[in-house]
Amino acid sequence: MTGWFTLGGMPTEHFVYTVHKIRDGGNYCVRSVTVTQIAEKGVCFTATMSFKRAEPSPFRFQHKLDIKKEYGPYIEAKKNMFDHPDMPSQDSWWFHNVHAPKNPNHFNPLGGLHLRKLNMKAYNEYRNPIDRRRLMMYSTRGSMPQIPASVLKAKKPKYSREANLHAIAHIYASDRNSLFVIGDHLEISADARRIATISHTVIFHVGVEELLFSNEPADEPSNAAPTERASGAADAPDPSVTERKWYMQEVWTDRAEGGRGLHRSRIWDPDTGVHLATTIQDGLVRFKDNSSPPKL
């Protein structure tokens, strides 16, 4: 999936999604999507989506990364995942250094996700900007529609449309506070003048059976940000679930010039070490004229 953000949206107006069929093939199908609000003002967002039928593979080849060896000390630095800092919906230098001190009681949690940011200061301190990493652990708020075991075990499983919600949750998580990492790793966050996404690409490398979130446990730590839900809602906690499922996004930047910057990431299952998805984001990133990041 690749989407282009072409016009700012208005939060008080509804969005209209129009889907166009490009091709239906034996193995692939392709769709394009355009999103508008007030039609005469133009398209807010456009995307191309390709979907491939699942098939067995005689091998699995991926970037070799021992997550526990490379990042274990940072993941396990806290007893519980909720002991790591909660990432706000705007994790910018301005929010932490200008807005938050003036508004100490203001907290802007991210809707739909529990998002925890690991402290990577010791890992990044003596590394070049291009080798620095940001790690985010995420899990869904509320329970998700679960796929029956009989479907998962079938030779040719037929998934319901609800199964796509698990993939959509990963796409949503992949673009949270993305471009702020450029200024952070170049040590010029305070010099940011304007930041906006141009395009965002997500490529899944696995089937939906490896992207599943658990239902929400009934017993959560006291420091878990509360989730508001209607009485009797379908996403209510599941008493049979004792531990929630977390995924990890590994983020870095390796290019910035001319008012643009590149955000890259890999999404991992930290329990299995499987590389689930890759993301690439091109962004408009402008800094003060005298900004000077550290040399490589």
Model-identified regions with their sequence ranges:
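Terminal targeting signals and extreme-terminal segments of soluble enzymes
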Residues: M1-L296
